[in-house]
A protein has these predicted regions:
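Short, solvent-exposed loop/turn segments at the edges of extracellular beta-sandwich modules
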Residues: 11-18
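Extracellular fibronectin type III
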Residues: 19-23
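Predominantly extracellular/luminal regions of secreted and cell-surface proteins
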Residues: 78-120
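An exposed acidic His-Trp-rich patch
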Residues: 168-212
Length: 212
């Protein structure tokens, strides 16, 4: 049956110090793959769809013929925008489970679409997922980031379509056991903002960012 599925692998080293690593990936099962033409260049990178194929060479959740971003620390916000999610060099951004199921090759997904996807995948819509006491006028950004040094902080830039209004808060989904909660600011976690320059956000850690 066509749909979105996940596969996970767990490896444990039984040496003196037990270490465990677990990886998970999502994949889409289709009745038939779309025909790729040598005359079509869907992502506009100068290479035909047929030549790029269905692979996901950089493992970011976007097939090669639809992916014109080489840098692993960049991810498209939406398919109709040039705005890019950005993390530090050396890290990797990957579409989250809901963004991957949304099949738009970008990290932005609406709350309504999340509910629809959960229904289509026959998952239970728990209170932890449906943050119904809040509205999300700027949408939900679903992604994972890897490659950062453990216990160290790193910068993540999320370009927004409009300025942040007074009273708006940044919330983060912490998994099914915790659910949604406001982003906790402390010595290691801080929110910054800056005006876009030529519709582009300053680089991560730029001095152009101010607190809040």
């Amino acid at each position: 049956k066509p749909g979105v599925f996940s596969i996970a692998a767990k490896a444990t080293d039984s040496a003196d110090i037990i270490a465990t690593t677990e990886v998970k990936t999502d994949f889409r099962l289709m009745e038939a793959a779309p025909d790729l033409s040598t005359e079509m260049d869907s992502d506009g990178d100068g290479v035909s769809d047929a030549d790029e194929g269905y692979d996901d060479s950089d493992n970011d959740g976007i097939v090669d013929y639809m992916d014109n971003i080489v840098e692993s620390n960049l991810a498209p916000i939406s398919e109709d925008s040039n705005r890019l999610l950005q993390s530090p060099e050396g890290t990797q951004l990957v579409l989250g489970e809901m963004a991957f199921a949304n099949a738009k090759n970008s990290v932005l997904v609406s709350r309504e679409k999340v509910i629809q996807i959960i229904s289509e995948l026959q998952l239970q819509l728990s209170e932890s997922i449906d943050d119904k006491d809040y509205i999300y006028p700027l949408g939900l950004y679903d992604f994972t980031i890897s490659g950062a040094i453990p216990s160290q902080s790193y910068y993540l830039v999320i370009p927004l379509p409009t300025a942040i209004e007074e009273g708006q808060v940044f919330r983060k989904y912490m998994g099914s056991k915790i659910g949604w909660q406001n982003f906790i600011e402390n010595a290691n976690n801080t929110l910054f903002s800056a005006k876009a320059i030529d519709e582009a956000c300053p680089e991560p850690a730029s001095r152009l960012y101010d607190y809040g």
